[in-house]
UniProtKB/Swiss-Prot annotation:
The keyword Isomerase does not apply. The gene is wtf18. Residues 11-29 have a biased composition (Basic and acidic residues). One of its GO terms (biological process) is meiotic drive. Pfam families: WTF. Homomer. Forms protein aggregates. The two isoforms can interact with each other and with themselves. High sequence similarity is required for their interaction. It comes from the Eukaryota. The keyword Transmembrane applies. This is Meiotic driver wtf18. Promotes unequal transmission of alleles from the parental zygote to progeny spores by acting as poison/antidote system where the poison and antidote proteins are produced from the same locus; the poison component is trans-acting and targets all spores within an ascus whereas the antidote component is spore-specific, leading to poisoning of all progeny that do not inherit the allele. Keywords: Cytoplasm, Endoplasmic reticulum, Membrane, Toxin, Transmembrane, Transmembrane helix, Vacuole. Residues 1-39 are annotated as: Disordered. Belongs to the WTF family.
Length: 410
């Protein structure tokens, strides 16, 4: 094939020429290379070949950088082989001792069992020699690995500290700006909130005062008109206070005799205060106080009679007896108070009522015995009638047969 006067070019030359034309559009085409005078630079293809040749030559040479520590260790190993071997053995033994004591601490709690002894002997007999041989034979490898790990760790920590310091500085700056804006916005917001809250509280105080005045008026009227509900409420309050007092007695913090006497007095004072607050009419307060004093008198009489009987018969009430007495007085007192408040004057009429009850009971017993006597008289009459019946039957048996036939015909 004829080249028609065109010089032969390689594919690399064409690619470099194409790239040169694409890159140097503003500067124009490069001058032709003249190998004779050498005044102009060679084309890019020859520069690329030269760079490639230099890189290939440099790649064939040694690329590993010599480490001073490795060189010093190699020189020490070559000059003092015995000391180096002894040092390797010492470090290996120290590592095995560390493993041995670690195994001893872990296995010591289980040493009394068979499993603990077997594990300990396996650790001593197999693991430690293998570990000693491995560390001694691969001393240089694992020391280099440890050194490399320490180096990488130190570099990583330094970078982490640097990044953290930069990050914290930026965070502090951003936080300071944010806090400044927050303080400004918060101050404005709090000023508005204080203003709105003051206006709202003023309105609330006004509305609350009016509402409480109406509530007090309604409650006073309602309590004045519903005396029965008030009596039930007072009675429930008395029950609660008595339970508290008897709980203190049960716990040992209060003497029972004092509790029996002081309970009514305390309740009277509390109810007096409550009734003064709700403005109950004076006759209701007077009635309640008389009822409480009457109940207190009944309780005191029961306590005195009980104590007198116990000392008269030379017997003392134990803890269980005190509880029974307290429960009885509690039930009697509440019943009498509630009955007095429901039916005014019931406690005053109680002696007469008790006398009438006793008289009625005795009259009932007399009537019962009279009825029993009448019953026995009726039984006697019935027996007499039965005797008369038997006597009449015997008289009929004495009549002759002829007379019986005549009577039958008639």
């Amino acid at each position: 094939m004829k080249n028609k006067g065109y010089p032969l070019r390689s594919s690399m030359d064409e690619l470099s020429t194409k790239n040169d034309n694409e890159i140097d559009l503003e500067k124009g085409p490069l001058p032709e290379y003249n190998s004779e005078d050498g005044s102009t630079l060679p084309p890019y293809s020859e520069i690329w070949k030269y760079i490639k040749t230099v890189s290939e030559d440099s790649s064939t040479g040694p690329t590993e950088t010599t480490n001073p520590n490795v060189e010093r260790r190699q020189e020490f190993k070559d000059s003092h082989p015995n000391i180096y071997s002894l040092l390797r053995l010492l470090i290996s033994v120290l590592a095995v001792i560390v493993v041995f004591f670690t195994a001893w601490v872990c296995v010591n709690p289980l040493e009394k069992s068979i499993f603990g002894k077997v594990a300990f002997f396996v650790t001593i007999g197999i693991t430690c020699p293998i570990l000693l041989i491995t560390i001694f034979c691969f001393f240089e490898t694992w020391t280099q690995a440890v050194a490399q790990c320490i180096k990488v760790t130190v570099i990583f920590l330094a970078q982490c500290v640097k990044v953290t310091a930069v990050f914290l500085a930026k965070c502090i700056k951003v936080t300071a700006v944010f806090l400044a804006k927050c303080v400004k916005v918060t101050a404005v917001f709090l000023a508005k909130c204080i203003k709105v809250t003051a206006v709202f509280l003023a309105k609330c105080v006004k509305v609350t005062a009016v509402f409480l005045a109406k509530c007090v008026k309604v409650i006073a009227v309602g309590l004045y008109n519903s005396k029965k509900d008030l009596v039930v409420t007072i009675w429930l309050a008395w029950v609660v206070i008595c339970f508290i007092l008897f709980g203190c007695v049960k716990d040992g913090r209060l003497n029972l005799n004092k509790a029996l006497i002081c309970s009514t007095c305390s309740i009277s004072a509390a109810l007096f205060f409550i009734l003064l607050l709700v403005c109950i009419p004076i006759w209701t307060l007077k009635h309640m106080l008389f009822g409480l004093f009457q109940v207190l008198g009944v309780q005191s009489c029961v306590v005195i009679v009980t104590k007198g009987l116990m000392y008269l018969f030379d017997k003392h009430i134990d803890a269980t007896g005190y509880e029974i007495e307290a429960s009885s007085l509690f039930v009697i007192g509440n019943f009498l108070f509630f009955y007095e408040m429901e039916r005014p004057g019931a406690l005053k009429r109680m002696p007469k009522f008790i006398g009438n009850g006793i008289a009625s009971f005795l009259g009932g017993l007399g009537n019962a015995f009279g009825g029993i006597g009448n019953a026995f008289g009726g039984i006697g009459n019935a027996i007499g009638r039965i005797g008369n019946a038997f006597r009449g039957a015997n008289d009929n048996n004495d009549i002759p047969l002829g007379e019986m036939d005549v009577e039958s015909e008639v």
